[in-house]
Amino acid sequence: TKHDSLKNDYEFLPRGATIALVIALITASLGIVMTTRLTIEFCTSVMVGFFLAACALHIPAIRNARFASAVGNTLAIIAILTMFAHDDILDSTLKPMLFGFGIALSSSEQLYKLLGSCDHCQRSTAESTYFLSSDGGLFLGIAAGWQLTTAVKSAEEIALGLLVVATIICSLNVLIKKKQAKHHA
């Protein structure tokens, strides 16, 4: 019946399954990196990156950008690659800021995509889908990070791989769906 179909998609938006997968991959990589580099400076710098992304998203050109998620993922990938390159003072300041900025930019773009793919009456379902996938991905990332704490480089390689897969998926989604609606914050 019609009432049963509403009950089935109350917590998860089926049309947003690929977007939810991308969100879970992004937050899983965040969880892995956060568990491998657990210092106050690193975590504070990631939060500063989140804040800078929130400020940048007030600029319409960034908020409505078609490949904002791919750009955010690329920034996070660059941050992880530079963490691999060599250890220096920037490992606890600038690199995590870049990582946090990229993760926040990409995650917010995915939320806008979820909200844009639903009807007005399904906005709370889209938000539930976002939080289920982001919290689930973060949990899996933290669990994987704690399992891999003895091998920091391999944990970061896994996080890097997750971000690459997320970038490919979100870029393909944008290329397949040529017409993208304006986002509303």
Predicted feature residues:
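C-terminal transmembrane helical hairpin of 12-TM major facilitator-type secondary transporters
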Residues: R66-Q110
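Transmembrane alpha-helices of Major Facilitator/SLC transporters
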Residues: F42-A65, S69-G72
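Multi-pass alpha-helical transporter architecture, strongest
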Residues: S154-A185
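A late C-terminal transmembrane helix in Major Facilitator Superfamily
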Residues: S117-V152
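Flexible interhelical linker loops that connect adjacent transmembrane helices
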Residues: T1-V22, H183
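Small-residue-mediated transmembrane helix hinge/kink sites in multi-pass secondary transporters
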Residues: L57-I59, Y112, I142-Q147
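Extracytoplasmic gate region of multi-pass secondary transporters
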Residues: L13-F51
